[in-house]
């Protein structure tokens, strides 16, 4: 029987607790890359069930599940134009920081 060829692997799987002073909740980052190091899947999320109980507490998120790049925001989902993974990370960070300034 032929051995299965690995075409992608999880490069990053991180969860960071946000202090109550900085807004509470968790930042979640998952990134999968192919054998050449190109990002093929990702999931970035700010989770805080005190702010939003729907969508498993995901307040803000970006991912490319189900074959499309999209943004989650308080339960709503909208498509995003994919330029690069770095661009997606910058958008996610900007959204999260903007949310903190609204409080």
Task: Give a label for each model feature.
Residues 2-70:
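The feature represents the first ordered module of a protein
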